[in-house]
Amino acid sequence: MNVHKRLALATAAVALGAGLAGTVPAQADQPSVSAQAATQRRDVCFSGACGSATVTFQSHYSAKVSMSVADNRCDAHPAKVRILADQYHLSTGSRYTWHGPWRVNHRGCHGGTGPAWNKTFVGGDPLLGMKVEICNDGVKCQTSSEMYNPY
C-alpha cells in the first residue's frame, strides 16, 4: 500500500473515531421499556356489553386499575366488568388467576358507562399480568388479551 493510501485511511479512521466519541447512544433520551409498557389498555366489545380497563403497573406486585362498562343492546341484561390478575405463587411455583369482584352497570343502555372503578391492586404474590372480562349478565362473556407486567 502506498503512503498516500495509508495516510488517507489513517485520517478517515481518526475522523470517524472523533465523530463517534462525542455521540450518545440513541436510547439515552428515550423512556425505558418498563416505563413505555407500564400503562396498557384493553377494550372488549360485543353485542350486549362494551367495556375497557386501563392498567398502570407500579411494581412486581401492584397496579392501578381503572375499568368501566356499558350496556349497548338495551336487552334488560346489565353489563358487568371485572379484572383477572395472573399471578405466580411463590411457595408452590405455579401460576394462578385471581378473579376480581364483578362491577355491574345497572343504568341500562342509556346510562353510559356507569360508575367507573378506580382502585389499586396489591397482591401478595408476583403479578404477571392482567386481563379484563366483560359480561352481559352471564348471557355472554368475553375476556381481553393479556396486559403483561413489565416489572
Could you tell me what each predicted segment is?
Residues 29-151:
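Post-signal peptide N-terminal regions of Sec-secreted extracellular proteins
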